[in-house]
């Protein structure tokens, strides 16, 4: 949490410009009841109603936070690219469809938690089920826990238990690494689908699969992670990844979108996109 009054804390959050010597973390009391809601959508275009329904639930306070992952973000933590395709370039659509079918996942996965007294959570869950029932073809699963229950690893982060799982970086094998190009994007379904398809084109043109996630930090915007996963011991992949990162930043600027963080090698490029005080 920030200190009271004027503060410089924000200059050093998620940056390499400061060394943290003292930090305080506000802990939340364990709720009486906790439900994990997971929603799977099969088609790329399902992201439009998925986002629009979620936005309404965020605005009225039913859902406090949420994450959405595309097929690659879901799969990369449990498999590697070579298990599905050994050719060059991104996975062809036929391989993506086979991966989703055999792994039992959708094109999109939405996850969030509902917290509070058991009766309150039950009312929230009823509202969630009614709202998402309007989307054809989705599958919803719910897991619930009472205070003191043991939380399985797959639900631990939604229970406030940190995770340092780096498995997704193994997608291409070798020494897994990634460059992030995350944008702050409006929580509007049609607008995001257009952006997603454009960024997929850019990822694929550079020879990479599009690892995409959305984190609902406020009821009106997402943080859209765009992770370029590569083998840092492969010089050719490193060069392509760096070039793609620059391209993603420049393309986002044309859409009047900006990131909330960037690799230090791109900080001047990012800063040049803002015109306050003559850059």
Q: Model-predicted segments: where are they?
A:
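Activity-critical C-terminal alpha-helical subdomain
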Residues: 261-279
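FAD-binding core of FAD-dependent oxidoreductases
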Residues: 1-32
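C-terminal substrate-recognition/cap domain of FAD-linked oxidoreductases
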Residues: 25-28, 35, 39-43, 48-51, ...
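Alpha-helix capping and helix-loop boundary segments enriched in small/acidic/polar residues
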Residues: 1, 8-11, 41-45, 236-239, ...
């Amino acid at each position: 949490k920030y200190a009271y009054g004027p503060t410089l804390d924000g200059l050093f959050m998620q940056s390499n410009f400061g060394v943290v010597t003292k930090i305080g973390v506000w802990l939340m009391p364990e709720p009486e009841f906790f439900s994990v809601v997971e929603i799977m959508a099969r088609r790329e275009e399902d992201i439009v109603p998925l986002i629009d329904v979620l936005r309404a639930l965020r605005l009225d306070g039913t859902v406090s936070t949420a994450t959405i992952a595309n097929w690659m973000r879901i799969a990369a933590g449990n498999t590697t690219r070579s298990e599905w395709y050994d050719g060059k370039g991104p996975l062809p659509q036929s391989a993506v469809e086979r991966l989703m079918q055999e792994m039992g996942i959708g094109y999109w996965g939405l996850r969030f938690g509902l917290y509070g007294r058991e009766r309150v959570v039950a009312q929230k869950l009823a509202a969630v089920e009614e709202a998402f029932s309007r989307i054809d073809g989705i599958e919803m699963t719910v897991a619930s826990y009472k205070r003191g229950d043991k939380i399985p690893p797959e639900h631990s982060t939604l229970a406030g238990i940190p995770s340092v799982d780096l498995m997704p970086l193994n997608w291409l094998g070798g020494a897994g690494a990634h460059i992030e190009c995350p944008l702050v994007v409006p929580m509007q379904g049609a607008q995001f689908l257009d952006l997603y398809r454009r960024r997929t084109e850019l990822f694929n043109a550079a020879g990479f699969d599009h690892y995409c996630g959305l984190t609902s930090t406020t009821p009106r915007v997402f943080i859209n992670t765009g992770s370029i996963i590569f083998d840092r011991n492969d010089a050719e992949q490193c060069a392509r990844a760096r070039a793609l990162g620059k391209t993603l930043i420049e393309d986002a600027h044309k859409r009047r979108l900006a990131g909330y963080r960037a690799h230090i090698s791109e900080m001047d490029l990012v800063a040049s996109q803002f015109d306050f005080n003559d850059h």
